Amino acid sequence: MKFDYVIGNPPYNANMYIDFIQMAYYHSKKASSYIVPAKWLNLTTFSDKTWWLLKYIRKVVYYRNTIDVFNIGEPDGIVYYLMTKEAGDTYELKGKDSLDKKYEFDWVTYPTGKVGEFWLCNNRLRGIFEKLKNFPSYKDYLLSDNHFLARDYYVNNQNLLHTNRGTDDVPIAVSVANTDNIKYIARKDMYHYDYIDKYKVTSSAMEILTHNFSDFNVGALDKGVGFYGSASMLGAFDSAIERDNCYDYLRSHFVQIITSLCIASSVMTADLFRLLPMLDFRYHWDFCSDDYLDDKGVTHKSLNRYLGLTNEEVTYIQNLGYGCSRY
């Protein structure tokens, strides 16, 4: 059975999404088209085995305001793209914005890119990410040891948890952000128990997928405190100062905007952090004009100066509404 048109709703899973458009390409006669959140046209979605598909994406229309297409809030906007049966090394991009015409632009030709590069439809952010990619990535920090990966810090068995503390037991936070709810486990029964003696920043794996790094969903744990369940460790430090600075950084508006442009699969992936600059957390980082020492003796570093961002770029990032249609 063959159809002239197929209307589908691809699942929000990166691998299944690729399967969906790959099969559509095979079955289409001349072309296929898609309306998806802009981040689904991200090159990080495509592996070296599926990158060839991008050569068939020839035209892209980017709607900065999602309300131009759907009555929803999507932080990275919406794209309509056309996939033909003829491959090419370039694609054409057009920008639409009903609320602010200065963000509209006519057809511009761009190279398709290489595996691992970032496909970005928002031209205002292109220059910013050209600067960010020159800095160490938080993703590489997460991958430096396997204990930073999701589900790798689970205890062997939840049945080993108990409410009364023994001689060599370790307290376990039942919630990554609620250290008042504590159970105990013998140190020998834990995975990566050596990192129990670090100051840690943790987050729920599900909240990582939704880019929801809020006060409630990110935990700052002390030495000697572990955690279990669907949690991931985003940092482990020798000092509480480094932990606190990392904790504040991951909850910042800047981090929420940068990570919202990346796709996370159904299992927490470090790719979510690939565009996020890794910083020296001996210092606290702010969008400020100069480095300064506050009344508590904390050194505040200028994030925008370190990254080489202009005042206009800083203002643009600060004004971006995370999760709203004016993005």
Residue ranges and their predicted role:
Residues M1:
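S-adenosyl-L-methionine
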Residues D4-M83, C246:
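Conserved Class I SAM-dependent methyltransferase catalytic core
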Residues N9, H27, Y249, S302-Y306, ...:
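Generic, well-ordered alpha-helical scaffold segments in large soluble proteins
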Residues I35-V36, L234-A236:
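Conserved beta-strand segments of the P-loop GTPase G domain that flank and frequently precede/overlap
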Residues P37, E86, N319:
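Surface loops and adjacent helix of pleckstrin homology
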Residues L41-N42, T210-N212, C324:
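Flexible loop/turn segments at secondary-structure boundaries
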Residues I67-G229, G235-N311, T315:
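C-terminal substrate-recognition regions of SAM-dependent nucleic acid methyltransferases
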Residues E312-Y327:
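Short, amphipathic C-terminal "tail helix"
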